[in-house]
């Protein structure tokens, strides 16, 4: 206990200090970036680190000299990072085949995470996975759509069942089924896990493979219209702003991967690309989402799934002591100001709690414990990720816009982008439809399963 207490004291700021100089355990960025890199990954969230990891795993013919990969993250404390502020869910229940396939890939990856991300002489990785199906409820108006979506999920190999109101009540007697026409329930490869552990596992493994990382802000693109297939010549400098020294550090690179999450769209707008190269604009915006925590000793208990209500409200169990997490996305016209991560507690009282209590009567007596806010990297075009090369800057690749499911799809998305960079094509999963072309052609791939 004494050693544990000392460890905790070593990992938090001293009294009276600020969080500005504090770094999470295990996070030690290089003081300065290297002068050159084959690939610069902008964004050190879980998607960015997944890309970096897979680049090193797939470097193949470059293995003799090694592919030099640099990850640039402007906030090494991760205090505003979408990854660590997520509720950590993974599910197979999506409405787009590509998303289902990425979920299946990621579930397999997480199941064998120590084979993929284990580092010699370091403790085994425990992402604290809690297996529990997602439970989607549908009213009469949404029943046919849910049934069709479940058939698609089954066709893709997902284990999902449909439940009638009677079956739903038998399995989860604490649910009010009054307005429920049908429900879908995942039988495997669904649940939740610790986001920070996955992020740090990707980072530790990638750095053990030789990936560099620095704290800084990417400020300019290496504008060229064709990229060096050998990845050996790095003659196109980008600028990285170093907040500690207030200097700009040039980094010559061949390829840039934009994995900046909620700020991926703004990154393209702000960093000096000629006007024609910014068209069409990348439709990714930061959207603030609240997560509330509450205690209810008479709540659903251990049988609680990750429930998504007909109203859009969701909740899941948090441990085994009667605690729960939940939230709800607001309508478009009521989006909160994303300029900070303050929480509107009236939103819980006026919008979320009535919906929770209607579905689970015991939640009438819940007691709020806390709340936080995080960001979705929200794709306003179709709520799906954008993966692949820029149409006119072939050395610029995109991996952003997942609209809330980037964490769970990070193993698959990182592999996909790395395959494009190293091999010039998708190999593990065919994700061509998620490329930039759909933005230019104005052909959205709508995902109906965004929570």
Residue ranges and their predicted role:
Residues 56-83:
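Glycine-rich FAD pyrophosphate-binding loop
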Residues 1-39, 57-67, 448:
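Extreme N-terminal leader/targeting segments of oxidoreductases
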């Amino acid at each position: 206990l004494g050693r544990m207490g000392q460890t905790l004291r070593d990992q938090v700021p001293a009294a009276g200090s600020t969080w500005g100089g504090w770094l999470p355990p295990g996070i030690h960025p290089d003081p300065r970036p290297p002068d050159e890199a084959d690939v610069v990954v902008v964004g050190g969230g879980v998607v960015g680190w997944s890309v970096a990891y897979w680049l090193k795993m797939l470097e193949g013919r470059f293995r003799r000299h090694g592919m030099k990969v640099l990850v640039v993250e402007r906030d090494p404390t991760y205090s505003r990072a979408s990854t660590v502020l997520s509720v950590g869910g993974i599910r197979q229940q999506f409405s787009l085949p590509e998303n289902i396939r990425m979920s299946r890939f990621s579930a397999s990856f997480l199941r064998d995470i120590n084979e993929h991300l284990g580092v010699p002489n370091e403790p085994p990785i425990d992402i604290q996975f809690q297996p529990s199906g997602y439970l989607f409820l549908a009213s009469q108006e949404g029943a046919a759509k849910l049934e069709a979506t479940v058939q698609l999920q089954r066709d893709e190999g997902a284990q999902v069942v449909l439940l009638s109101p009677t079956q739903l009540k038998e399995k989860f007697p604490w649910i009010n089924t009054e307005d429920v026409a049908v429900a879908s329930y995942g039988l495997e490869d669904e649940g939740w896990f610790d986001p920070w552990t996955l992020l740090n596992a990707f980072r530790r493994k990638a750095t053990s493979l030789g990936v560099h990382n620095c704290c800084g802000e990417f400020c300019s693109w290496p504008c060229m219209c064709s990229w060096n297939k050998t990845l050996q010549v790095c003659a196109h400098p980008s600028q990285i702003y170093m907040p500690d020294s207030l200097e700009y550090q040039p980094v010559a690179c061949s390829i840039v991967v934009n994995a900046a999450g909620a700020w991926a769209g703004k990154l393209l707008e702000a960093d000096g690309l000629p006007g024609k190269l910014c068209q069409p604009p990348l439709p990714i915006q930061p959207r603030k989402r609240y997560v509330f925590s509450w205690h209810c000793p008479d709540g659903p208990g251990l049988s609680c799934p990750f429930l998504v209500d007909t109203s859009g409200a969701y909740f899941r169990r948090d441990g085994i002591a009667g605690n729960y997490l939940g939230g709800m996305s607001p309508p478009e016209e009521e989006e909160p100001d994303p300029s900070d991560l303050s929480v509107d507690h009236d939103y819980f009282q006026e919008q979320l709690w009535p919906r929770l209590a209607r579905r689970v009567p015991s939640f009438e007596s819940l007691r709020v414990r806390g709340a936080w806010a995080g960001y979705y990297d929200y794709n306003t075009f179709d709520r799906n990720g954008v993966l692949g090369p820029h149409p006119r800057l072939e050395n610029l690749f995109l991996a952003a816009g997942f609209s809330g499911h980037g964490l769970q799809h990070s193993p698959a998305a990182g592999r996909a982008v790395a395959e494009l960079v190293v091999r010039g094509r998708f190999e593990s999963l065919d994700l061509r439809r998620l490329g930039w072309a759909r933005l230019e052609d104005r052909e959205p791939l709508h995902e109906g399963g965004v929570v």
